[in-house]
Amino acid sequence: MPVSMAVCETANVVNAALRESLGGNSSAAGSSADQAKSGEESNGSLQNHIVANAKRILMAKIEYEEVPNYHESVLESLKSKYIVIKPGNPGAINGFGGKNNTGKVVGANGHDNNGARKQAEHPNNQSHHNNHNNHPHPTSNPNELPKPKRVLYPRENIRIGWKQSERKWQVGTGMINVGNTCYLNSTLQALLHIPALANWLVSEQAHLENCNVAESGGGCIVCAMAKTLLATQSNQSAVRPFLIYSKLKQICKHMVVGRQEDAHEFLRFLVEAMERAYLMRFRNYKELDQLVKETTPLGQIFGGYLRSEVRCLSCNHVSITFQHFQDLLLDIRKADTLEDAFEGHFSRERLEDMGYKCEGCKKKVSATKQFSLERAPITLCIQLKRFSMIGNKLTKQISFKPRIDLSKYAARSPAAQAQPLTYRLVSMVTHLGVSQHCGHYTAIGSTDTGSYYNFDDSYVRPIAMQSVCNTNAYIMFYELDLSQTASPAANRPNGMRLTNGHSTTPVPATTVSSPSPTRFIGPQLPPGGVNGYSNGNAQKTAIQFKQHHQQSQQNGFQLGTGKFQDTAKPPLVGAHAKGEANPAPTANGNKSSSTSSNNSSSSNHKSINQQQYLPISSEDEDSEDERTSRPSTVQLPSMPKMTDDHTEKPKSPVKIQAKTPIKTPLKSLVPYESASEEEEAPLPNPRKRRSGEDSSESDQESGQTNGHSKTNGSLTNGSASSSVHVNNSKLKTDAIDEIFKSLKKSADSDDDDDEEESSIQLTNGWHPQKQSQSQSKAPPSPKTPPSPAVIKSKTGIWKVTRNDEVDDIDDDDDEEEEATVKIQTPSKTHRNPFSSSKPSTDSPATPGAKRQKLLNGSPVKSHQQPRVGNGYQSEATSNGSTINELLKQSHRGYGSSVLSWNGKPAELEKETFELVCAKRIAGHGSVDGSDIVESSVAVNASSGSDSNDVVVIAVALLVDAREQRQRDLDDDEENEMDRGRQRKVKSGSAKGNNASNSTPGYNPFQEYEGQKRWNKNGGGGGGFPRFYNQNFRQNFQQRNKFKFNRFGGPGGAKFQQQRALQRHLAAGGGFSRRQPSAQQQQQQS
């Protein structure tokens, strides 16, 4: 071992004697030197001085110590004076001895350097003392992370991921709780399901065989962990972790067997015990410095380094230090997500005012402090601060994602920028309870197949990813995801082999490159570019694109836009063309040029295909979905070019009429779809159809919205003549109104355009209303969609219809009405339910045949006056199957009725028979329905119908009106039970075996509210109302005793008949037309 004495250069006795002899008398020494050089005089006087001084020096006691080399003896003491280097000093040599603005020579840390001028005058002397700065050494640059002198376990030997091991990994068995050891079981399960740690433990087979630590026959703590891992992999039943449980006192002295402990505290002591056990393999482990001790396998797996920058607010002096960590403790008091907690941890914080002593100012000043990742760990351990010092627990829900990216928290150093920072969730520890001293710990771990399992002591069960993300986590383990950060060898010569934090300078990403000579004609997309964005290198992966994008944002660069066009073409100019690259339009797909709801289905399919190449993460997609931007679609040479104009017509080979721009994006509250799966047709706006005028006779094709018609995913001008006028009224921005777009057409009074009229196929048996010229001055009537909306839900496909339609019961003689109106009906095809069809000729047909054609989808002409029924129109004549078809399409008994799309009843007038009926259904008008009868008689007087038919119609309308009022007044708790997803079955009695003895209005869903069963003496109440019937429970009577007073008071077969009809309809059965009894005719008359 080399020896260096404490006196350094004076160790040589001869040299010391010479210096002391010559230094005693400068003049004599100078003359003696001259005499010695010239050789003219003898050197006797010099010898005398040397002998005298040598004797004294040899007799002096010299203290020395053994050191490895000269640097650690002398230069290590000097290193403490130059810990901090002042950045941005161009005049400094190697960061030392530079001049500041005032001309004062300062050191690297901002202090006065008295020896700086001397070192500058004697560069050789400086290079001698600072020789260690001229070659790689732990103190090469204090602004960089120092390298350890010795690496105990190379970082490159850590195998990341389950696939890196040749072993076939199993899910693992549970662990038996031997008495308040759930914290130990859950911590062990979380650790053993970390791939990097499990692979290292399996690789310690040689140490297991030769372990010389005999502690209770189980070896060291590392051997105990490895044996526990092998036991969980090989056994079929739950194991007892006695090897770890027996060493609890060795792991932590203050932990008591059988007492509940904190899982994170046990985790920290367990990892430290494993590190100590590994260091004991080396003889001089106590003499190792801290940097070397941090290179153990546990330190390489869990260890990382944080860069701490403290900036003085007075002189802007920055003090940089590095801190080793094995877990991040995140404060969640002001965070709702894991990203918020990271933002708070790595944000710049202000220290206590006048509480930091600046090394440059030499006084206490205000300063700021900020952390950044200098070297990220392979396995990131995150502990959420849920417990306080007194044991209270913060039980708030913190949402997190299975994959996180920490690249924005990396330090601004080359070594930090070159490392991968994409992590995936591998295991976690959860706590159930209200405090630290009680509760239960469980663990969640991943397997080599990517699935997750919940480990609750000895119970092991699979768990879904959604449940994992909704877990109230306490400790989380994320591991580097090499599959997401793998890059070509051109940028990283060593592949993904992790260095010790000091790798070569990464190749800078180029954002502009020469265009590819190949021009793609088809809809293909290269891996490098999406939606007009391209990083100029087709062989780079998606994660590289994101990293380059983030770096370009920091450096102020902008990504180029190729768009499969020639280089001479200008780049895309949009809302995102600013000082930084913004791939927001790529996240939410391609939008239409007017940002309206008239998006073609082809662009929607294109956006779905393009999202497969998106280079940004899912969280960016979620946040960017709400933005509205100009189009950034890929323009191919074979595709029509569209401009970014929002108001004018785009220049395109296809005639396109872009109109009605909407500033707010279209957001659907429910997934409405048309009857065809291939295209989505816009639905009318209820506010527009209330405020707009009636649609008169026009010669345009159906399915047009604001003058367009959807044809094969593109907007084409589908109007047939110039008589179509688009109403440019103000668009409504209500949330519900955004779902619909109405068709407003002005009235056209020409009678000679019968040959140009297009008959439209009936959808679900409904006709849109069309009034004749004589009724053109009538008050506006509602405009209705051709077909009910189709809703896709988890329970199936639903159609939204009204449950209070008008049940028409007319005879076959009503086909001879005077008012002949030609109805325009939408034709439904397999491609577009709103597309038009050729005009059909007028052919008379019987009502039965006409109804059959309507049901089969054939376009016909209607010669009858259409009737309005609560916002929908139906034909005036029908056969006996009309009501059955209506009842089959209705949703009676499925919940509360839908009055209109905005929740309000339709505003209809009373001037026609249909409007009066709608008022009846909405609950207006007289109680006995006399005005309905009068209106029906007045309307049908000219048709020559029998009075019996009129009475039948009036009775049916009155019954339906009463049913609607009854449904509107049902208890809220009945409607809130299932929200219409399950059909309510109303049986007649407690046993439900006799429909004749059924109690009106009884609902089995309300049985849980009653405490006693009603009597079984059954039977109806004769002529008494329901609240006089003794078969009802008292609480049921109390809630419903005021509901039926407005039906005419007690008594009467009229009430019983009405209730019987309601029970029949509620049971789901249809009913055929029946002749009214004489008693009913007498009551109605």
UniProtKB/Swiss-Prot annotation:
Reactions listed under catalytic activity: Thiol-dependent hydrolysis of ester, thioester, amide, peptide and isopeptide bonds formed by the C-terminal Gly of ubiquitin (a 76-residue protein attached to proteins as an intracellular targeting signal)
Compositional bias annotation for Low complexity: 23-36, 503-518, 588-609, 768-778, 987-998, 1056-1066
Record's keyword annotation contains Protease: yes
USP domain sequence ranges: 173-481
Entry EC number(s): 3.4.19.12
Biased composition regions of type Pro residues, renumbered to the chain: 779-788
Chain positions with Phosphothreonine modification: 660, 664, 784, 825, 846
Stored SUPFAM superfamilies: Cysteine proteinases
Gene3D superfamilies, A to Z: Cysteine proteinases
GO biological process per UniProt: germ-line stem cell population maintenance; heterochromatin formation; negative regulation of antimicrobial peptide production; negative regulation of innate immune response; negative regulation of macroautophagy; negative regulation of peptidoglycan recognition protein signaling pathway; positive regulation of proteasomal protein catabolic process; protein deubiquitination
Record-level Gene Ontology MF annotations: cysteine-type deubiquitinase activity; K63-linked deubiquitinase activity
Cellular location(s): Nucleus, Nucleolus
Group of enzyme by EC: hydrolase
Main location: nucleus
Region feature Disordered, mapped onto this chain: 23-47, 104-149, 489-730, 745-888, 963-1030, 1043-1085
Gene Ontology cellular-component terms listed: cytosol; nucleolus
Keyword hit for Protease: yes
Domain of life: Eukaryota
Biased composition, class Basic and acidic residues, residue ranges: 642-651
Summary of subunit composition and partner proteins: Interacts with atms/PAF1, but not with CycT.
Function: Required for maintaining multiple types of adult stem cells, including male and female germline, epithelial follicle cell and intestinal stem cells. May function as a transcriptional repressor by continually deubiquiting histone H2B at the promoters of genes critical for cellular differentiation, thereby preventing histone H3 'Lys-4' trimethylation (H3K4). Controls selective autophagy activation by ubiquitinated proteins.
Similarity comment: Belongs to the peptidase C19 family.
Xref: PANTHER family: UBIQUITIN CARBOXYL-TERMINAL HYDROLASE (PTHR24006), UBIQUITIN CARBOXYL-TERMINAL HYDROLASE 36 (PTHR24006:SF758)
Protein name, UniProt field: Ubiquitin carboxyl-terminal hydrolase 36
Lineage, uppermost ranks: Eukaryota, Metazoa, Ecdysozoa, Arthropoda, Hexapoda
The gene coding this protein: Usp36
